[in-house]
From Swiss-Prot:
It catalyses: 2 superoxide + 2 H(+) = H2O2 + O2. Belongs to the iron/manganese superoxide dismutase family. Its EC number is 1.15.1.1. Mn(2+) binds at residues 1, 49, 133, 137. PANTHER family: SUPEROXIDE DISMUTASE 2, SUPEROXIDE DISMUTASE [MN], MITOCHONDRIAL. Its cofactor is Mn(2+). Destroys superoxide anion radicals which are normally produced within the cells and which are toxic to biological systems. The gene is sodA. GO terms for molecular function: metal ion binding; superoxide dismutase activity. Signal peptide: none annotated. The lineage of its organism: Bacteria, Bacillati, Actinomycetota, Actinomycetes, Mycobacteriales. This is Superoxide dismutase [Mn].
Length: 138
């Protein structure tokens, strides 16, 4: 996954930056918009995967402890209720995307949400803590 999909996003970022620079030099506005869109897509894929890699463990995982466990209990009622809500977010994605557990720094609480495709437009003030890749290749 790392050497294929994530590497393709990094290459896509580099290619889009080069093509964007060329399009700007030529005042080719159609190409500018296309390459800005491509840059956003590939940069989103890179960012999402970079967060996801940090969520993985060779030994699997278990229920969190400490402050995170307390925050999950406060926000969702229990770890099992969080798992049910997070699973619903993941399984409810239409098409490709990501399920996310994030810390809302403005509201001082945890929440779950979905990112579609490779969007990296996480809501303002949200810090992603856990992301699950729900693309068909995952």
């Amino acid at each position: 996954h790392h050497s294929k999909h994530h590497a393709a996003y990094v290459k896509g970022v580099n290619d889009a930056v080069a093509k964007l620079e060329e399009a700007r030099a030529k005042d080719d506005h159609s190409a500018i918009f296309l390459n800005e869109k491509n840059l956003a897509f590939h940069l989103g894929g890179h960012v999402n995967h970079s967060i996801w890699w940090k969520n993985l463990s060779p030994n699997g995982g278990d229920k969190p402890t400490g402050d995170l466990a307390s925050a999950i209990d406060d926000a969702f009622g229990s770890f099992d209720k969080f798992r049910a809500q997070f699973s619903a977010a993941a399984n409810g994605l239409q098409g490709s995307g990501w399920a996310v557990l994030g810390y809302d720094s403005l509201g001082d609480k945890l929440l779950t949400f979905q990112l579609y495709d490779q969007q990296a437009n996480v809501p303002l003030g949200i810090i992603p803590l856990l992301q699950v890749d729900m693309w068909e290749h995952a």
